[in-house]
Amino acid sequence: MSIEVKNLLKEYGAQKAVNAISFKVGKGEIVGFLGPNGAGKSTTMKIITGYLQQTSGEVFVCGINVAEEPLDIKKKIGYLPELNALYYDMYVREYLGFVAEVHKVNSPRSTVDRVVDLVGLTPESKKKIGQLSKGYKQRVGLAAALIHDPEVLILDEPTTGLDPNQIVEIREVIKKQGKNKTVLFSSHILQEVEAICDRVIIINKGVLVANDTLSNLQKGDKDNHFVIVQFKDPLDKIIFEGLDSITKTEQLQSTRFKLQT
């Protein structure tokens, strides 16, 4: 499994930004990480990429414990953060060449040419980053995330600031990368996730509320209803077996269950 998150908890004082969530993402999957602003998506992604320490729980990327080997993890991950930090006084190719050298990429010049073409930066590639539109700055960040050919891509709202045509182009780039890589792609817009993702993980107020394929989530059988219940102490979902009114039980956390009737 390329990404494995186990009972991840991140607390800021009394606030639980991420509340004991667990999920897995396999190679070749493009998984949408959906939720409203402030749901905990960016916090989770920062922990997965080794830029933020969790309060408890474990995260593994390509079998490596992120908390124990944060530098090794960064070699395997291409990360586009929500706030894309760029050097505005550097030229596009100059900056990407610098990133390639940091990652010790073989043939940095040809690699820069490849990613510039891949993300559609060619017309603007000789400009300073500070002269670019917000959409093209976003492309520079995506190119930097791809430059070392990582196994895993973590993209935090990658289409922010793009016009409709640019959004379609970037979606195609992400789809192509998803054939050989693991992609976790966050958004607060359902249509964005529908366009490119195989599966959706939904989080709200730090709690995982759904983890399923789009087709299953969209079926919406009107005869079925579900309720989420939480107990004080951890329980095994076997306690719900034999109850005629419950057709399906999903354990969201050790004390939290989704019951379908």
PLM segments and residue spans:
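ABC transporter nucleotide-binding domains
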Residues: 2-5, 10-204, 210
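Residue-level marker of alpha-helix boundaries and capping positions
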Residues: 103, 260-261
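ABC transporter nucleotide-binding domain
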Residues: 169-260
